[in-house]
């Protein structure tokens, strides 16, 4: 059950609803992120519906019984699709948002060069990994806080807000001091303590689909974040593991419209990790835009041959010029506008 509060509901109204539910033996979880606060209920829902006059409480707009196991992220209670804003940059149904940058932050020079390439390629958000969960314990694990500081310096230079991954619940507070958006990667999609921690952090969250996860499992993971009060969640389809060996992963392009039908959350696509090869990134980007994705997230590197992480899939300048052309020309055909990048800082060389 979900209680939708009126847009002008006061803090006192919300707290009163929570108290009523608690006194009845249930749990109430307040989420903010849309036009009105939403309160998700758990417990004896049938008894609550029969004995509690929830619709009569001050500030309550409506009460919705949901059949989906994911209550707060479901389209059952929020019919219109959500828009998530990352430092003012929108991700939602009317725009195409390009997120680009290096898979891993290596040096200040490499990160700044990649950010300038990303901006020239139509990106409005900068991705970059400071903490890297790798399949091999011997692979480059990221620069940690040093990498976060590099990203912050590059943001100041280029004006691009930061999207970066957090891999441990203990690091959420640290990463949140630098990041504009927190990313939960495929390997951590069901790391429930991490999901709860990012849900309480007060930052927008990008949730990548687990490499072997069903769409329902993906949405249930998003529910963990929403239940902690954060509905500013963007879902990212990044390819799933199948028997196919010709590509790094298999892009489940059908997951985009399915997830958009089931959930009000924005859905973007990662063509870089799906294909794992530079020559596949642009074709998969076209497919993502055509199917109605709300954005794409792309790996960029000024010198892919020396990259410490995922060089074979990173785009270079010529690819980015083509990507900018693709995004500019395809966006209007699917009823969208390309999200512009924020203005760079005064005096910067971006």
Label each region the model flagged.
Residues 8, 41, 96-113, 136-142, ...:
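Active-site mouth loops of central-metabolism enzymes
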Residues 86, 199-300:
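Catalytic alpha/beta core domains of metabolic enzymes, predominantly
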Residues 96-102, 124-128, 162-165, 180-184, ...:
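Hydrophobic faces of well-ordered beta-strands that scaffold small-molecule active sites
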Residues 1-98, 344-350:
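Non-catalytic terminal accessory/regulatory regions of metabolic enzymes
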Residues 75-80, 136-150, 169-171, 186-202, ...:
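Active-site-adjacent beta->alpha loops and helix N-cap segments on the catalytic face
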Residues 127-145, 302-312:
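Glycine-rich, proline-tolerant flexible connector loops at the mouths of alpha/beta enzymes
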Residues 6, 143, 159-168, 180-193, ...:
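Catalytic beta/alpha-barrel core
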Residues 140-164, 197-204, 253-267, 313-336:
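Alpha-helix-loop-beta-strand connector modules within alpha/beta enzyme cores
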């Amino acid at each position: 059950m979900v209680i939708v509060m009126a847009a002008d509901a006061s803090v006192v109204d919300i707290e009163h609803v929570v108290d009523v539910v608690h006194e009845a033996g249930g749990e109430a979880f307040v989420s903010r992120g849309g036009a009105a606060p939403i309160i998700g209920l758990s417990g004896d829902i049938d008894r609550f519906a029969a004995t509690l006059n929830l619709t009569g409480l001050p500030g309550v707009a409506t009460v919705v019984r949901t059949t989906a196991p994911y209550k707060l992220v479901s389209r059952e209670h929020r019919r219109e699709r959500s828009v998530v804003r990352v430092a003012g940059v929108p991700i939602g149904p009317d725009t195409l948002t390009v997120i680009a940058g290096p898979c891993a932050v290596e040096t200040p020079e490499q990160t700044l060069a990649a950010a300038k390439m990303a901006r020239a390629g139509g990106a409005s958000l900068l991705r970059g990994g400071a903490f890297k969960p790798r399949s091999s314990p011997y692979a480059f694990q990221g620069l940690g806080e040093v990498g976060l500081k590099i990203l912050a310096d590059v943001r100041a230079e280029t004006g691009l807000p930061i999207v970066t991954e957090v891999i441990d619940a203990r690091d959420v507070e640290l990463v949140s001091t630098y990041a504009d958006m927190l990313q939960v990667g495929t390997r951590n999609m069901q790391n429930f303590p991490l999901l709860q921690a990012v849900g309480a952090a007060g930052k927008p969250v990008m949730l990548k689909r687990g490499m072997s996860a069903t769409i329902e499992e993906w949405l249930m993971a998003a529910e963990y974040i929403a239940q902690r009060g954060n509905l500013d969640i963007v879902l990212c389809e990044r390819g799933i593991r199948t028997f196919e060996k010709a590509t790094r992963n298999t892009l489940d392009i059908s997951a985009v419209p399915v997830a958009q039908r089931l959930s009000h959350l924005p859905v973007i696509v990662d063509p870089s990790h799906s294909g794992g090869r530079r020559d596949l990134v642009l074709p998969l980007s076209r497919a993502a835009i055509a199917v109605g994705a709300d954005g794409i997230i792309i790996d960029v590197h000024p010198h892919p041959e020396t990259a410490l992480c995922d060089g074979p899939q990173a785009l270079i300048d010529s690819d980015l010029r083509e990507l900018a052309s693709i995004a500019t020309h395809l966006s209007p055909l699917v009823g969208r506008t390309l999200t512009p990048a924020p203005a760079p800082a005064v005096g910067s060389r971006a």
